[in-house]
């Protein structure tokens, strides 16, 4: 079967890989000049099922109110503009903030994330792909005792659903990652997830695209997409700057652009862009930079060692499709990295970056079938696109091929939003 994949980020490229392995004739279309140059380019680097707790949970509302008006807020909503999609998304977000909904959404996200981590391990063993990976786990650190206790309760939900999470004392945290020694006295505790990983998502995407091309996948670069063309209950083609591309099936993996492409077809995807920030710091003192990936819960920032670089990333800014970096937020990340790892690298040579993540109100991706019989979704992964990329790609490849997914699809599709009135 001829299949077109729309988008060559880590999710779209993984989709192409698994579709090619299933025997399909695959074409990937992307407006950029190579793979993984937007959301996947300089993210936090974590393969993190441990981050399955959704943004919408009972504890987030007091925090959002506290953060209102602060440019340095970890989660910044710019509500002072009339954007019906943003306000509708916000109402759905509020509807998912109950404890029961948060646990349901944690299980759904974790189901995909654990499967994806296993798929990544199989792919790595099969191909030998290298991407500055560290298979050393992820350590969450907490300075506030109440936040640590809340995190331990949230960890129990994930443990029930199959994820190993281990509460640790401050001394145990620095034993796991000695580079935390400068802040041991500030810590209330930590939670270690030993089976999680980290690695360079852009390098992985670029290498996987090369492997996919060797399997016959065609990548069409520098081809802006204009629209999806419908014919009744099917997609008839993809209108691009380079003409119309036709196939038997289409996989929409265009990240934040997915709802823009779907809307003219009558398909409303509840996805909004969340701008994330990172800085990449050259490591000039290997003992001072962490090897275990770290999540600083207080500041909602993550740190991953990528070879001779330290990637620090975090915060989320709901500001529409504005891709321009906010220097205040990049500086915030850099300052926190310097405080946590004072000997971690040459902070004066840090490279700032900002990119948009496609976020759903419940933090669960949109996977699988749509009302259009030959259009499939692989989008809406939020901050966990790298984490869920391989599993999501394999799921969609199975469904396109007419095979059942290896995991339950319950609650992962667009149909879960049909009960809403907005």
Swiss-Prot record:
<comment type="similarity">
    <text>Belongs to the DadA oxidoreductase family.</text>
</comment>
<dbReference type="GO" id="GO:0005737">
    <property type="term" value="C:cytoplasm"/>
</dbReference>
<comment type="pathway">
    <text>Amino-acid degradation; D-alanine degradation; NH(3) and pyruvate from D-alanine: step 1/1.</text>
</comment>
<dbReference type="GO" id="GO:0008718">
    <property type="term" value="F:D-amino-acid dehydrogenase activity"/>
</dbReference>
<dbReference type="InterPro" id="IPR023080">
    <property type="entry name" value="DadA"/>
</dbReference>
<keyword id="KW-0285">Flavoprotein</keyword>
<feature type="binding site">
    <location>
        <begin position="3"/>
        <end position="17"/>
    </location>
    <ligand>
        <name>FAD</name>
    </ligand>
</feature>
<dbReference type="GO" id="GO:0055130">
    <property type="term" value="P:D-alanine catabolic process"/>
</dbReference>
<dbReference type="GO" id="GO:0005886">
    <property type="term" value="C:plasma membrane"/>
</dbReference>
<dbReference type="InterPro" id="IPR036188">
    <property type="entry name" value="FAD/NAD-bd_sf"/>
</dbReference>
<protein>
    <recommendedName>
        <fullName>D-amino acid dehydrogenase</fullName>
        <ecNumber>1.4.99.-</ecNumber>
    </recommendedName>
</protein>
<comment type="function">
    <text>Oxidative deamination of D-amino acids.</text>
</comment>
<dbReference type="InterPro" id="IPR006076">
    <property type="entry name" value="FAD-dep_OxRdtase"/>
</dbReference>
<keyword id="KW-0560">Oxidoreductase</keyword>
<keyword id="KW-0274">FAD</keyword>
<dbReference type="Pfam" id="PF01266">
    <property type="entry name" value="DAO"/>
</dbReference>
